[in-house]
From Swiss-Prot:
Residues 374-436 form the TRAM domain. Residues 145-371 form the Radical SAM core domain. Catalyzes the methylthiolation of N6-(dimethylallyl)adenosine (i(6)A), leading to the formation of 2-methylthio-N6-(dimethylallyl)adenosine (ms(2)i(6)A) at position 37 in tRNAs that read codons beginning with uridine. It is found in: Cytoplasm. GO terms for cellular component: cytosol. Keywords: 4Fe-4S, Cytoplasm, Iron, Iron-sulfur, Metal-binding, S-adenosyl-L-methionine, Transferase, tRNA processing. Monomer. Signal peptide: none annotated. One of its GO terms (molecular function) is 4 iron, 4 sulfur cluster binding. Disulfide bonds: none annotated. Its EC number is 2.8.4.3. Binds 2 [4Fe-4S] clusters. One cluster is coordinated with 3 cysteines and an exchangeable S-adenosyl-L-methionine. This is tRNA-2-methylthio-N(6)-dimethylallyladenosine synthase.
Length: 437
């Protein structure tokens, strides 16, 4: 019997890309491929790319360049580029890096097996269409092999908001939601394979409309699945946090008290320039309503500093918003222009100014995060163990609030959900002690 062909996938960027890479690996598994952790051993290399951060495309071209010696050594090696850089760059990738055999966008990866077959004939294979049919209808059933206790599940893709800085509407397309019945089927399958926590994914997940009662309705249906202990969702837009979803945070025990709700800026002038379609005040009022429903919720956010036209006062407004809200986790970045977006045509804030503002903002966010973590010492938490720790007999898992917790638990296993007392806080994690059952 011939040895199976080997597939190496390198994943960049968001959780949705992680999910997409899993599905691509499964699709290629049906073609006889098994995954390998070493590009040197692969018969096919696939880069699943992200286009959000600065110079994303150039980083992909640089990575491809490192495969030139390997391609020369193994002429039958197939190299593909998938994801959002593939969508944005298209055939330009093959022009700049002729070693690339196939390019596939995020809405067409269900066609990966046929593109691979085309590439095997020596032809270049390209598919960056936004197909009419739902790609999920054309993916093979997920394998029944056991897996870890947590999983991502994409329920929504694309975005209709057209923020001035963002490429997502151009690389992922318009908002599309998967029908609730199909999401529930996949969720039940994941639970049967050992999953106890599911994170629902979407570029704008709370705009989900595949259920008659929106994302809240889907969450309540998921909560009925025996064996599914925890539900999370990300990423959300403030304008789509409706009353039903806020109420679910207060009433659904399986919905974890954690919410990633990007705001990007605390300045109304900059929010308008970003085309965010909300104000700082409306965001703060929304946070108050969410906290009224779930007082212990941990909030996470995204911030961009140095957006074109940002003044010292605009930045001060952002700092004031952060002080008012109090974030347990946040992601902050210096603005970098994305080609093809409206903001790319505007004059940038000087780099040294943006750098200084970012440093100031991150210092505040770090203080807030550390204060919230320190306040957990002496409290109890339920921790879902995901993997062994670095120390003998240690397990690592996540609390309800998505904090990493290290626990001495020599008799525990992945997937155990245990009560612990938080004994110590460090910069990026907590240490817990098992509470006897």
């Amino acid at each position: 019997m011939a040895d199976p062909k080997k597939l190496y996938i390198k994943t960049y960027g968001c959780q949705m890309n992680v999910y997409d890479s899993e599905r691509m690996a499964e699709a290629m598994g049906g073609e006889g491929y098994v995954q390998t952790d070493r590009a040197e051993d692969a018969d096919m290399i696939l880069l699943n790319t992200c286009h959000i951060r600065e110079k994303a495309a150039e980083k992909v071209y640089s990575e491809l360049g490192r495969f030139k010696p390997l391609k020369a050594e193994k002429p039958d090696l197939k190299i593909g580029v998938a994801g959002c850089v593939a969508q944005a760059e298209g055939a330009e990738i093959m022009r700049r890096q002729p070693l690339v055999d196939l390019v596939v966008g995020p809405q067409a990866y269900h066609r990966l097996p046929e593109l691979t077959a085309r590439a095997a004939t020596g032809a270049k294979a390209l598919d960056t269409d936004f197909p009419e049919e739902d790609k999920f209808d054309h993916l093979a059933a997920r394998p029944k092999a056991k897996r870890g206790p947590t999983a991502f599940l994409t329920v929504q893709e694309g975005c209709d908001k057209f923020c001035a800085f963002c490429v997502v509407p151009y690389t992922r397309g318009a908002e599309v939601s998967r029908p609730a019945a199909r999401v529930l089927t996949e969720a039940r399958d994941l639970v049967e394979r050992g999953v106890r926590e599911i994170t629902l994914l979407g570029q704008n997940v709370n705009a989900y409309h595949g259920h008659a009662r929106g994302l809240a309705g889907l969450i309540w249906d998921l909560a009925e699945i025996d064996g599914l202990e925890r539900i999370r969702f990300t990423t959300s837009h403030p304008n789509d946090m409706d009353d039903a979803l806020i109420a679910a945070h207060g009433a659904c025990d399986k919905l974890m008290p954690y919410l990633h709700l990007p705001v990007q800026s605390g300045s109304d002038r900059i929010l308008k320039a970003m085309n965010r379609k909300h104000t700082a005040e409306s965001y703060i009022r929304l946070i108050e309503r969410i906290r009224a429903a779930r007082p212990d919720i941990l909030l996470s956010g995204d911030f961009i500093v140095g957006f074109p036209g940002e003044t010292d006062q605009d930045f001060a407004d952002t700092m004031a918003l952060v002080e008012a809200v109090g974030y347990g986790q946040a992601y902050s970045f210096k603005y970098s222009a994305r080609p093809g977006t409206p903001a790319a045509e505007k004059e940038d804030v000087p780099g040294e100014v943006a750098d200084a503002r970012l440093q100031t903002l991150q210092a505040l966010l770090t203080r807030q995060q550390r204060a919230i973590q320190d306040a957990k010492v002496g409290t109890t938490a339920r921790v879902l163990f995901e993997k062994p720790g670095r120390l003998p007999g240690q397990m690592v898992g996540k609390s309800e609030h998505l904090h990493a917790v290290h626990v001495a638990a020599p008799d525990a296993a992945r997937g155990d959900l245990v009560r612990v007392r938080i004994a110590e806080s460090s910069a990026n994690s907590l240490r817990g002690v098992l509470i006897a059952a």
